[in-house]
Swiss-Prot record:
GO molecular function: N-succinylarginine dihydrolase activity
InterPro entries found in the cross-reference section: AstB_sf (IPR037031), SuccinylArg_d-Hdrlase_AstB (IPR007079)
SUPFAM superfamilies to which the protein is assigned, alphabetical: Pentein (SSF55909)
Task performed by this protein: Catalyzes the hydrolysis of N(2)-succinylarginine into N(2)-succinylornithine, ammonia and CO(2).
The EC number(s) this enzyme carries: 3.5.3.23
Recorded family membership: Belongs to the succinylarginine dihydrolase family.
Record: active site: 174, 248, 365 (nucleophile)
Gene name as annotated: astB
Keywords: Arginine metabolism, Hydrolase
Protein name: N-succinylarginine dihydrolase
Signal sequence range: none
The organism's taxonomic lineage, starting at the top: Bacteria, Pseudomonadati, Pseudomonadota, Gammaproteobacteria, Enterobacterales
Reaction catalyzed: N(2)-succinyl-L-arginine + 2 H2O + 2 H(+) = N(2)-succinyl-L-ornithine + 2 NH4(+) + CO2
Binding site for substrate: 19-28, 110, 137-138, 212, 250, 359
Pathway given in the UniProt record: Amino-acid degradation; L-arginine degradation via AST pathway; L-glutamate and succinate from L-arginine: step 2/5
Amino acid sequence: MNAWEVNFDGLVGLTHHYAGLSFGNEASTRHRFQVSNPRQAAKQGLLKMKALADAGFPQAVIPPHERPFIPVLRQLGFSGSDEQVLEKVARQAPHWLSSVSSASPMWVANAATIAPSADTLDGKVHLTVANLNNKFHRSLEAHVTESLLKAIFNDEEKFSVHSALPQVALLGDEGAANHNRLGGHYGEPGMQLFVYGREEGNDTRPSRYPARQTREASEAVARLNQVNPQQVIFAQQNPDVIDQGVFHNDVIAVSNRQVLFCHQQAFARQSQLLANLRARVNGFMAIEVPATQVSVSDAVSTYLFNSQLLSRDDGSMMLVLPQECREHAGVWGYLNELLAADNPISELKVFDLRESMANGGGPACLRLRVVLTEEERRAVNPAVMMNDTLFNALNDWVDRYYRDRLTAADLADPQLLRGGREALDVLSQLLNLGSVYPFQREGGGNG
């Protein structure tokens, strides 16, 4: 059956700021306390979405979350009106204010793990929300992510959206950023490659930075998504590269159809894994980048592998890259050699995503890939699909509500909270989502 990959990109939220919340993510740490530009961040993301939609790649949008997220501050013991809660936390414990104001839901590669209908036992598309257990600020996302996905994939005959795994370290799950699918045409059954950083009872794990994904979580997600057991491979990421800042697999590898583009040090027991893939995926091609040409450090600083590998109708592929790749002579030199070599990659497309990149999120972090048949695509909430009308409406919305400068101190401004809620109210109507945010269901959250 014919099917296409639809990229659902996260729209950057109104409180996008640099707080260095993500230990193990070196860009996040390096840019801590810099002044951010939420308006520019959102527009950079929108430009990528629109350019890819115009180039013929189906594209949709996932909206931001409510931030600052007052209900969690109340759970932490801050009381009073919303304004009083903000004032107290800013004075007594500003790090909590930063955490509950993170715009990290923009990186929707961590929103969920997807199984296309061609791979599942019941023939539905399955989406399992990630618990993002390793980081407090990201663990807050799961409930609203589930509401958003259910509002977008709202046809229960075709889609099953599963709640996140229990919030414990043993079941740490980071979603599609640690998941690849390999195979032929999108509508054919594919091989799902789940990548984990640690498993219980196995001493092979990083020592400097945390391994956020567990094998136990990956196995549970594969079960929830009803993936045919014959179409699953579990592989461990190389712990040495996690210790060099590769906090998700999509920082060191990207797949599309029959191609796996990865660093030669991406996986533990890599040669064994590639041999397994060759045996199980027709036409499998590994493009391994040698460390002598691109070091792990350069891969992390440029986000070479946090790219999007997209298929054209003729079977050729386009690699979508952040501007940092073009600005690095060694990486850009390698990429031009890649273009000239015998492989499906025939075009490089570069985007300026600096606002997201400074927090450690490149093109691949910003998108959730969902393979859909034509019938399934028609069943998706049509209001989220990118086109000229939506692009213009979202740009106008960003111009109306977003600040062009934000510091950590600004997060305590009650107007940021009020304006953010008004903005999301308008957006949820524009995208026909219903009441997906807690403040919409609780009358403003003054509890």
